[in-house]
């Protein structure tokens, strides 16, 4: 273990730290996407609570592995990955399918619009927290202190 502002962080090699970082971003996307696609995704309160729990647990796990500064950046990167995935894997493909069905003269599947709206709404509400976490690197008051966890 090495010491930083928070106390102790995991003694990881560069390769291990990169693996944890990239792996957790992918795992975070798949977990978030899974929650949204299951029946849980239809219950806004339950989905919100579970997504919040994923963020909090991820923040805690990151803070045990990395410095507090890096932990905030990693949580921000994880949520930003969700937002990017929403755009490239849900919103844009669904929009293309709706446009294609309209061009063929068919009625579009309303489920495609509902899925895109759900993810677009999530992106709207996740924007400010992601900005805060990404900018936190420039403001030590956000990651230095006695009461981090």
Regions found by a protein language model. Name each.
Residues 1-149:
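Polytopic transmembrane helical bundles with strong interfacial aromatic enrichment
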């Amino acid at each position: 273990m090495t010491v930083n502002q928070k106390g102790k962080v995991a003694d990881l090699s560069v390769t291990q730290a990169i693996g944890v970082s990239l792996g957790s971003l992918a795992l975070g996307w798949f977990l978030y996407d899974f929650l949204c696609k299951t029946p849980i995704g239809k219950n806004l309160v339950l989905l919100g609570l579970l997504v919040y729990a994923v963020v909090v647990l991820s923040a805690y796990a990151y803070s045990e592995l990395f410095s507090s500064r890096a932990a905030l950046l990693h949580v921000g990167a994880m949520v930003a990955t969700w937002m990017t995935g929403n755009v490239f894997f849900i919103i844009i493909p669904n929009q293309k399918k709706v446009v294609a069905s309209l061009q063929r003269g068919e009625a579009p599947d309303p489920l495609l619009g509902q899925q895109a709206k759900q993810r677009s709404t999530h992106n709207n509400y996740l924007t400010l927290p992601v900005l805060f976490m990404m900018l936190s690197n420039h403001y030590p008051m956000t990651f230095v202190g006695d009461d981090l966890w």
